[in-house]
Amino acid sequence: MNRYHFVGIKGTGMSPLAQILFDMNNEVRGSDVEKAFFTEEALNRKGIEILPFDPENISEDQIVVQGNAFSDDHPEIVRARELGLTIYKYYEFLGELANHYTSVAITGSHGKTSTTGLLAHVMRGIEPTSFLIGDGTGEGVADSKNFVFEACEYKRHFLYYRPDYAIMTNIDFDHSDYFSGLDDVIDAFQEMAKQVKKGIIACGDDENLQQIQANVPLVYYGFGAHNDFRAEQVTSTENGTTFDVFLRDDFYGTFRIPGYGDHSVLNALAVIATCDYENLPKELVKERLETFNGVKRRFSESTLNDQVLVDDYAHHPREISATVEAARKKYGNREVVAIFQPHTYTRLKSFMDDFATALAEADTVYLCDIFGSAREQEGTVTIEDLQSRIEGAHILKRGGTGVLRNHADAVLLFMGAGDIQTYQREYEEVVKLEA
């Protein structure tokens, strides 16, 4: 048994990694800011201690895991170096852990978390599988053969991984504080592809992924006729989405998923192709796909009187469009209201017009103040800059969420990667107080 201390244990990758090590009978604790994050719920359930930052948290018998958001001059990291402790960056430790399993890395500019969650759900129902999902969920399963994990492209961290398989969902320009442009992102994915050991499952409808060269078999999935795994006859029903799958030109089977939207079908195709490559029984894969309840903060639904409230992590224009599409396919002619909080000034500045176009797909738009990050607390753009590009858009301030009551029988999409949940909770409290 080892003793681990996580610096930044509430991170979306750090929290599940801590859970995995805890499940493997290690002693695990960590430190972070006091502000509540959804990622700490699972830590609390497992009794993993969360401490305020303090150099005194570091002791001589620990292995230290350093979160990506924390620099080498953080007081706890400085103390760990003084004591001569072994210190791993998050991505370094994850890369070493994955080497002990048949590993599947899920990467892409969008859809990583949902696809990782879906693959983990399917595989763990068929054979022992450990997993790390970027919604704060992780589990280390005894006697696991497989390890399914989310692999982020930011700062090329995924180059620390050498997985057996990789699912690549798409390539898009994001993280403009690091990548110089789309070509830089494509280059990063190309580097990653060269490190995969057995096979790559990639979305063939993404023209950027079609450029990828690999030293292993490359299987494509999508809607286009050129794909190896292809979805046809896609139908939205009251209980989800059904579609036929063809493997090249041969009928493979009819599948049903609880989710809606083209992105949900693509995620399922990626999982179907991966499981076929690993020779997992098709009928069991079908059964598991039908019982997937989603991951945290990805179209997470609740009801409030006659309204549907959706909590979603969408923070890029393409993700916003996918969320609006899913709402329309599931709820038909009901009004779709977008409540959006931009995440980082750099991202908003880089994609200002694209955000405006995506948000305009909703019937009504409310904009919340920009959420900075640990790396960026201020910038040269304002929320009013975005408002001016969307006809009829409103600014939503804290304390003013009661205005959302005006949208009877609507679907309210609370979208963002910051603390948009606080706006939703405030609105829920306003309505409950009036009941």
Swiss-Prot record:
ATP binds at G108, S109, H110, G111, K112, T113, S114. SUPFAM superfamilies: MurCD N-terminal domain (SSF51984), MurD-like peptide ligases, catalytic domain (SSF53623), MurD-like peptide ligases, peptide-binding domain (SSF53244). Pathway: Cell wall biogenesis; peptidoglycan biosynthesis. Its EC number is 6.3.2.8. InterPro entries: Mur-like_cat_sf, Mur_ligase_C, Mur_ligase_C_dom_sf, Mur_ligase_cen, Mur_ligase_N, MurCDEF_pg_biosynth, UDP-N-AcMur_Ala_ligase_MurC. One of its GO terms (cellular component) is cytoplasm. It is an enzyme of class 6 (ligase). It catalyses: UDP-N-acetyl-alpha-D-muramate + L-alanine + ATP = UDP-N-acetyl-alpha-D-muramoyl-L-alanine + ADP + phosphate + H(+). One of its GO terms (molecular function) is UDP-N-acetylmuramate-L-alanine ligase activity. It holds the Pfam family Mur_ligase. Keywords: ATP-binding, Cell cycle, Cell division, Cell shape, Cell wall biogenesis/degradation, Cytoplasm, Ligase, Nucleotide-binding, Peptidoglycan synthesis. Signal peptide: none annotated. It is found in: Cytoplasm. One of its GO terms (biological process) is cell wall organization. Cell wall formation. Belongs to the MurCDEF family. This is UDP-N-acetylmuramate--L-alanine ligase. It comes from Exiguobacterium sp. (strain ATCC BAA-1283 / AT1b).
